[in-house]
Amino acid sequence: MYHPVRGQTDRTPNILADGTKITIHKASEYNYVAVSRNLLKRWGGWLDFGDFIVLSGTDGKDGVYQVKDTMNKRFVNRIDILESPGVKPYKFTDAKIKKANLNEDIKFITN
C-alpha cells in the first residue's frame, strides 16, 4: 500500500499516472491501485490504466480496484493499494489478483 505523499510519489501526489486528480485525504475511498511497470501493457504486461482487478486472499482488503497509477521502475511484480495519509502500513504476500470480468465480478462486490 502507499500514501499519496511526496516521499512515496512524485512532486504531484494528487495526480496519478493516468492523469486522474484525487483529494489526498480521501484516497482510501477511491479503490485505486498502482502497479509495477512490468505489469502494464505499455511495458509488455497484461494490465492497462483503467482496467479493473479483483484482489482476494487479503485480510479485509478483498475487492475490485481500478489501475490508475504506476511505480518506480525498481519495483517488479507488485500492486499497491492507494490509501489516505494516516492509514497504518500493511502488506500482503499471498494475495491473488486477476483482471476483472465486470459482468461477473460486480456480483462479487454487491453480494
Please place each PLM-identified region on the residue numbering.
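Solvent-exposed, well-ordered loop and adjacent helix/strand elements within mature globular domains
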Residues: M1-N111
